[in-house]
């Protein structure tokens, strides 16, 4: 009897686990695979762009389809899903998480560590270069289906694209948790539809299946040489969004993403590309728009609508990724403080960063108006993706050797294959710099300069502060030995270094000559892991006389919460805190550029401008503004 009950419980647990896995896989399809899932709208069309001069013969079609197929298998199916996704930082993925993981076993002061940090930051900057192109090209290519379905409405493609994009960014501040539940099922429908369209045409031209043989890819490269290498720059469009598989791993887990990729996404993409190839063999004139011409005439308008919805979902994933990456970069100290709003009480990852939102929209609208069509924009797409792919491979190599202690020869063999592929794609995309590749490169380079300037500037400020600082604990002992006038209430001094006396305390003692009966020195520290366990978050020291030194640790995926820290500290020390009865003392730093060693004077001025425009600590830490006392201090750099 007991055996029967245990067997039933085990079967129920297994069934529940499978159901949960399927639910996560469907949710992942709606978030992770939107970008790569909408690539069939433009990838093959761009590969046979007239500018490439590739004839639409059966052999060249088989060759290009073979290249697309093996790019998906090698880069998505093997590199990312089997290797890169193993390199998780406590379950979190993405280029910054990978960078933090690769730096962990290294001395942060070495040149190697500095180079890896710069690589990781540049990879993050290139993501933003990609983030401004994905919504523009995706939505535009979907709306361009109107040119096939109803040619007399072709003049409305640009206005409709602009309206959709403005609406998409406008709703961000309200959160997308509610409609987000529909993303997964809608994208499942999308992948089923594009697979069915592909199967229909494969059945009519079954010879296209021969493209599975890599001989056709190799033969195409050998026959066309330089032209074929240029085509590689378009082939990479089938991989846009591959980085999202790794970047969004923390939201869904590796297993659900692999299940979705191998079970639905990759088969659907392959079937659709093969279907487009079959259509072109049958009717080379279909190169006008091979994706939409897969559909029978009666299904064109519904397919345009479904495509538009799918591209909006793909754009949403990129926008959410930009918010998450910005939040990580703020916590890791690479970006100035910005206002980060949580749009859902239930979902921790649902955030909204107003500055990023409106900057993205402005740049995207400029791109749409400037490039006017997805064909023109396709030349700009790919270089940011391939640069990030190369950086991910290099950082993963360091993790394999330094963190996992894999055999160096084995790692060398694996990385040599992946780097050869990545660098091949990256080199092909460099040929498109003049046609539009300058755009993501320019955006990435500008952001890289700003982020490195901010990081270097903050480092100099910390050095100057530490050099002039006074050790905290001896100072407090002296203060208690000769105490100033004590006043009732609680004072919280926010400080970046729990070993030094906050400048705000020195100014308060100098001008007001009082010390609150309960005084807390609070320091927030960001770790190189995504999340910190609640039971290890707080550490505190009782300095006596109602003085406490408190350190709160957060992961780079978390947002510091002053209220939660005080509540936790109060519980452990049998105290209560009311924010409206507590005074917060902050040092308002004014950075003064000088000719002191550190950075060139013009970079110091840029840093000073960034510092001046960073979000106020009251906004960032959600402290009531009427409970804050800011005391000014000048720092020469």
From Swiss-Prot:
Leader peptide range in chain numbering: none
Principal subcellular localization: membrane
Source lineage: Bacteria, Pseudomonadati, Pseudomonadota, Betaproteobacteria, Burkholderiales
Keywords attached to this entry: Cell inner membrane, Cell membrane, Ion transport, Membrane, Potassium, Potassium transport, Symport, Transmembrane, Transmembrane helix, Transport
Record GO terms (molecular function): potassium ion transmembrane transporter activity; symporter activity
Function statement: Transport of potassium into the cell. Likely operates as a K(+):H(+) symporter.
Gene Ontology CC entries for this record: plasma membrane
Protein name: Probable potassium transport system protein Kup
Record flagged with keyword Cell membrane: yes
Membrane-protein topology: Multi-pass membrane protein
Catalytic activity as recorded in UniProt: K(+)(in) + H(+)(in) = K(+)(out) + H(+)(out)
Organism: Burkholderia ambifaria (strain MC40-6)
Gene name for this UniProt entry: kup
InterPro entries assigned: K+_transporter, K_trans_C, K_trans_N, Kup
HAMAP family hit by this protein: Kup (MF_01522)
Similarity comment text for this entry: Belongs to the HAK/KUP transporter (TC 2.A.72) family.
Compartments where located: Cell inner membrane
TM segment ranges: 24-44, 64-84, 113-133, 151-171, 182-202, 225-245, 261-281, 290-310, 351-371, 381-401, 409-429, 433-453
């Amino acid at each position: 009897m007991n055996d029967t009950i245990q067997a039933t419980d085990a079967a129920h647990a297994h069934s529940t686990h499978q159901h949960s896995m399927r639910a996560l896989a469907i949710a992942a399809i709606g978030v992770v695979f939107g970008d790569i899932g909408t690539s069939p709208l433009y990838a093959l069309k761009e590969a046979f762009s007239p500018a490439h001069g590739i004839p639409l013969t059966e052999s060249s079609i088989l060759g290009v389809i073979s290249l697309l197929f093996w790019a998906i298998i090698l880069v998505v199916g093997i590199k990312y899903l089997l290797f890169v996704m193993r390199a998780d930082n406590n379950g979190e993925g993405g280029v910054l998480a990978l960078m933090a993981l690769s730096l962990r076993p290294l001395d942060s002061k070495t040149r190697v560590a500095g180079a890896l940090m710069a690589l990781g930051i540049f990879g993050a900057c290139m993501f933003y270069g990609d983030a401004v192109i994905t919504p523009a090209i995706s939505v535009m290519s979907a709306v361009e289906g109107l040119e096939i379905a109803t040619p007399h409405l072709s003049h409305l493609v640009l206005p409709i694209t602009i309206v959709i994009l403005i609406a998409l960014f406008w709703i961000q501040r309200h959160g997308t948790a509610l409609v987000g539940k529909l993303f997964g099922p809608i994208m499942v429908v999308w992948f089923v539809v594009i697979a069915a369209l592909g199967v229909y045409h494969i059945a009519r031209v079954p010879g296209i299946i021969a493209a599975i043989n890599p001989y056709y890819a190799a033969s195409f490269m050998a026959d066309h040489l330089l032209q074929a290498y240029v085509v590689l720059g378009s082939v990479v469009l089938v991989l846009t969004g591959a980085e999202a598989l790794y970047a969004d791993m923390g939201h869904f887990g590796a297993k659900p993403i692999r299940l979705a990729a191998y079970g639905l996404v990759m088969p659907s993409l392959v079937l659709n590309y093969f279907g487009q190839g079959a259509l072109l063999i049958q009717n080379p004139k279909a190169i006008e728009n091979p994706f939409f011409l897969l559909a029978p005439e009666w299904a064109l308008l519904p397919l345009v609508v479904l495509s538009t919805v799918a591209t909006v979902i793909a754009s949403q994933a990129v926008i959410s990724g930009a918010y998450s990456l910005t939040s990580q970069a703020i916590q890791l100290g690479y970006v100035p403080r910005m206002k980060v709003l949580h749009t859902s009480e239930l979902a921790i990852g649902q955030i909204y960063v107003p500055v990023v939102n409106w900057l993205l929209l402005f740049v995207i609208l400029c791109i749409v108006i400037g490039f006017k069509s997805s064909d023109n924009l396709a030349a700009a797409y790919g270089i940011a993706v391939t640069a990030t792919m190369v950086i991910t491979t290099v950082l993963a190599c360091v993790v394999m050797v330094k963190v996992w202690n894999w055999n160096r020869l084995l790692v060398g063999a694996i990385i040599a294959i992946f780097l050869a592929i990545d660098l091949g794609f990256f080199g092909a995309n460099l040929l498109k710099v003049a046609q539009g590749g300058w755009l993501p490169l320019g955006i990435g380079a500008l952001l890289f300069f700003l982020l490195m300037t901010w990081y270097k500037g903050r480092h100099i400020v910390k050095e100057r502060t530490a050099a002039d600082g006074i050790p905290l604990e001896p100072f407090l002992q002296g203060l208690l030995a000769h105490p100033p006038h004590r006043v009732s209430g609680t004072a919280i001094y926010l400080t970046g270094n729990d070993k030094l006396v906050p400048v705000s305390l020195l100014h308060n003692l100098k001008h007001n000559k009082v010390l609150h009966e309960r005084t807390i020195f609070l320091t927030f520290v960001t770790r190189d892991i995504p999340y910190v366990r609640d039971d290890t978050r707080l550490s505190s020291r009782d300095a006596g006389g109602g003085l406490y030194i408190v350190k709160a640790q957060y992961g780079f995926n978390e947002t510091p919460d002053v209220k939660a820290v005080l509540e936790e500290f109060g519980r452990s020390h049998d105290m209560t805190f009311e924010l409206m009865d507590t005074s917060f003392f902050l040092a308002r730093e004014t950075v003064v550029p000088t000719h002191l060693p550190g950075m060139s004077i013009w970079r110091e001025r840029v840093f000073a401008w960034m510092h001046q425009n960073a979000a106020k600590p009251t906004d960032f830490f959600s402290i009531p503004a009427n409970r804050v006392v800011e005391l000014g201090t000048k720092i020469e750099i």
